[in-house]
């Protein structure tokens, strides 16, 4: 097997006590995706022979949440990072090298890892950092020539070693030919009673194998998450990076600090996004689209020249060109709007196709429906699509005028150019061009006297 064969081991067995959560630490999200999922994505981009994920605490939750084509290995006892990598040994190739990553270091990037792998060659690679505050972290110990000789955990460090600013990020490249022997020789004779993976550095030096340190160019790339404060800090860093990329690509963000992307955003030119908008999943926005403040848009496609007014929610839907949506509109899954459609305040659409130029400007529910072009819904129109057991379809033709406060009881079909009187409950099909009225005739009672309250 060639020496450049790459195995990747991701350590994800920890409990994460300081998260104060029933959820395993690696499932907490950055940018809408579990941290472990992000690390697996990065690992996969390196095209390794295999990816082995070591899990332990909450393993069933992890397996259910992160369904990926990797090798899952259970660490039944959490006895340290060295022990965790040892559990993965049966799944590693005899030759080549192994890159060790961490499920709670979500922002590590491909570029940094490629640099580390290139520097390590077939020897040992070590990713280091010089943070502003190294408290609690393992220190990099060098000899008089500047060569790395060991890593000392803070709990085991003396005063001189604690004064060292350069720290171990935990990310290592190790030669597989030596890995098993090194792991088998680890001792737990230390302050934490654990098998430290970091002790392999001293073993490599003792075997005459050079350790190649690479300092990460930005500290947050190798930052781990141990509590909700650190999670929030990395979330903001991640969102700031995404906002900056969009700004560089020509998107106008009214306030980059008040923008969240939890997926991917494909955009055209001259897109304007106001404050506090959240984008989730796969979102595509055409040219000259404006998104108002406080919108939530998930898995949606928005055509060119459309405007989404504030406080609108769009999910799993398609908006055609030159639409006007909102404010306070809700487009639910399988809503598909053609061009020039107007959907106004407090209008909800679900599993419905809306034809070109149709308008529903106020207080309307359209569900399980097919609507033609240039139709108008009066305020308060409701499509009653559910009979308590089954959903039923409503078909509405072109140039239909539906009066205010109408109920269309599905299944029902309204032909082209139908008009319904305000307040009607339409339960039967209406042919083209007809006027449908379905309400009680108004009665005025002459001589009626409104009763008065008894005087005390």
Swiss-Prot record:
Its cofactor is Mg(2+). InterPro entries: Bifunctional_GlmU, GlmU-like, GlmU_C_LbH, Hexapep, MobA-like_NTP_Trfase, Nucleotide-diphossugar_trans, Trimer_LpxA-like_sf. Residues 229-249 are annotated as: Linker. Mg(2+) binds at residues 104, 226. One of its GO terms (molecular function) is magnesium ion binding. Its EC number is 2.7.7.23, 2.3.1.157. Residues 250-456 are annotated as: N-acetyltransferase. One of its GO terms (cellular component) is cytoplasm. The keyword Protein transport does not apply. UDP-N-acetyl-alpha-D-glucosamine binds at residues 11-14, 25, 75, 80-81, 102-104, 138, 153, 168, 226, 332, 350, 365, 376. Residues 1-228 are annotated as: Pyrophosphorylase. The active site is at residue 362. GO terms for biological process: cell morphogenesis; cell wall organization; lipid A biosynthetic process; peptidoglycan biosynthetic process; regulation of cell shape; UDP-N-acetylglucosamine biosynthetic process. It catalyses: alpha-D-glucosamine 1-phosphate + acetyl-CoA = N-acetyl-alpha-D-glucosamine 1-phosphate + CoA + H(+); N-acetyl-alpha-D-glucosamine 1-phosphate + UTP + H(+) = UDP-N-acetyl-alpha-D-glucosamine + diphosphate. Binds 1 Mg(2+) ion per subunit. In the N-terminal section; belongs to the N-acetylglucosamine-1-phosphate uridyltransferase family. In the C-terminal section; belongs to the transferase hexapeptide repeat family. This is Bifunctional protein GlmU.
């Amino acid at each position: 097997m060639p020496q450049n064969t790459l195995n990747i081991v991701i350590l994800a067995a920890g409990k994460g006590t300081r998260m104060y959560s029933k959820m395993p630490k690696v499932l907490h999200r950055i940018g809408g995706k579990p941290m472990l999922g992000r690390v697996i994505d990065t690992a996969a981009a390196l095209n390794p022979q295999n990816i082995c994920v070591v899990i332990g605490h909450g393993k069933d939750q992890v397996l259910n949440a992160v369904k990926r084509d990797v090798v899952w290995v259970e660490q039944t006892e959490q006895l340290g990072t060295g022990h965790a990598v040892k559990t993965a040994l049966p799944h590693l190739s005899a030759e080549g090298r192994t890159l060790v990553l961490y499920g709670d270091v979500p922002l590590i990037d491909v570029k940094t890892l490629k640099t580390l792998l290139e520097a390590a060659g077939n020897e040992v690679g070590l990713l280091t950092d010089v943070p502003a505050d190294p408290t609690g972290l393992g220190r990099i110990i060098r000899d008089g020539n500047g060569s790395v000789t060991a890593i000392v955990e803070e709990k085991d460090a003396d005063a001189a070693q604690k004064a060292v600013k350069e720290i171990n990020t935990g990310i290592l490249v190790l030669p597989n030919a030596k890995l098993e022997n090194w792991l088998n020789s680890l001792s737990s004779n230390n302050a934490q009673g654990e098998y430290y993976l970091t002790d392999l550095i001293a073993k490599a030096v003792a075997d005459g194998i050079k350790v190649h340190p690479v300092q990460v160019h930005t500290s947050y790339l190798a930052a781990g998450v141990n509590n909700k404060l650190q999670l929030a800090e990395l979330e903001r860093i991640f969102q700031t990076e995404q906002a900056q990329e969009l700004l560089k690509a020509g998107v106008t963000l009214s306030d980059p600090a008040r923008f969240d992307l939890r997926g991917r955003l494909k955009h055209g030119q001259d897109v304007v996004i106001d404050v506090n908008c959240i984008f989730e999943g796969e979102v595509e926005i055409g040219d000259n689209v404006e998104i108002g403040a406080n919108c939530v848009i998930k898995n949606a496609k928005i055509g060119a020249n459309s405007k989404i007014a504030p406080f609108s929610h769009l999910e799993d839907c398609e908006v055609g060109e030159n639409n006007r949506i909102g404010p306070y509109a809700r487009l639910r899954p399988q809503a598909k709007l053609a061009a020039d459609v107007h959907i106004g305040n407090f209008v909800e659409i679900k599993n419905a196709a809306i034809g070109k130029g149709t308008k529903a400007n106020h207080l309307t529910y359209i569900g399980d429906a097919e609507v033609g072009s240039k139709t108008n819904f009066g305020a308060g129109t409701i499509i009653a699509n559910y009979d308590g057991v089954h959903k039923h379809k409503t078909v509405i033709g072109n140039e239909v005028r539906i009066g205010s406060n109408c109920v269309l009881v599905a299944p029902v079909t309204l032909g082209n150019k139908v008009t319904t009187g305000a307040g009607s409950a339409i339960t039967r099909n209406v042919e083209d061009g007809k006027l449908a009225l379905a309400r009680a005739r108004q009665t005025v009672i002459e001589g009626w006297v409104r009763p008065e309250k008894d005087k005390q």
